[in-house]
Design a protein with these regions (language model features):
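Ser/Thr/Pro/Gly-biased, low-complexity, turn-/loop-rich segments
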Residues: 2-6, 20, 24-257
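Bacterial N-terminal signal peptides
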Residues: 12-20
């Protein structure tokens, strides 16, 4: 009987079993858009635009050919010798207190709708002729937490950001992040909604939370492999020890007979 050959085979068996016990993740747990076919076209018909909320901080800049007539609207504060355009907080009633116009209700409007509202008010009151209105949300940010490489709060410069873009800002998911059950927490005027999204399915593009709104919270939970690793390292170690013991016992029995 070739004892060396038996020892080699048993050693290989131990290594294979150890690898099997410690490797739980599979391709289907990691790859995005798994049911998307090659060269398949998905038309983005979503015209989603974030709506203004209570607590949003906005800036409104008005311009006309005659800049002198817009000065009462473009109030500035002096910061270090430089003029900085004053911003406005949307109050609990959904209004801002704007120069000359007074209370302006912005709650629930998109940025474009807010621009048009100001233009209409200037026109109706015969205050400005053909004004250009630049309206921005200054505190548009999203929070990404959990199993991502760079969790944190990320400012957004545009009018909308997709969940994929937000995860990209956070350095993408770690290998331990669960891709099929990402949680998006959204707060609109005190009412919170909780929506799950599956990045492994191409239908993610049709999700109502594919495009995020200001102050959305994105949480990536750990996958089963990570959970098992956190709570089951000792258990796996015990299984490996027991397996090794049984194989060693078998080896001793074989060599003695």
């Amino acid at each position: 009987m070739n004892i060396s050959l038996i020892k080699s085979k048993l050693l290989i068996a131990i290594l294979v079993i150890s690898t099997f016990l410690t490797s739980c993740a599979s391709k289907k747990d990691i790859v995005y858009f798994q049911n998307a076919k090659s060269f398949e076209t998905i038309v983005d018909t979503d015209t989603f635009k974030a709506k203004l909320k209570v607590g949003d901080i906005v800036s409104v800049y008005v311009s006309t050919l005659d800049q002198t007539v817009t000065q009462p609207y473009n109030l500035v504060r002096n910061t270090g010798g430089q003029g900085e355009l004053i911003d406005y907080l949307i109050d609990v009633d959904g209004n801002i207190d704007y120069p000359v116009l007074g209370k302006v209700k912005l709650l629930g409007l998109t940025v474009e709708e807010a621009k048009n509202l100001f233009k209409k008010k200037f026109a109706d009151g015969q205050l400005l002729k053909d004004p250009v209105v630049i309206f921005r949300v200054l505190n548009f940010r999203v929070t990404v937490a959990g199993e991502v490489n760079r969790p944190g709060v990320y400012p957004v410069s545009g009018e909308r950001v997709s969940i994929l873009e937000a995860l990209g800002l956070a350095g993408d998911l770690t290998i331990k992040g669960r891709r099929d059950n990402i949680l998006v927490v959204r707060d609109f005027n005190g009412t919170k909604t909780y929506t799950r999204i599956d990045l492994t399915n191409k239908e993610v593009f049709n999700s109502p939370v594919y495009y995020l709104t200001q102050n959305d919270y994105v949480y990536v939970e750990p996958n089963n492999s990570a959970i098992s690793g956190a709570s089951g390292d000792a258990r796996i170690g015990n299984l490996i020890t027991i397996t090794s013991f049984l194989i060693t016992t078998a080896l001793i029995f074989i060599t003695r007979n």
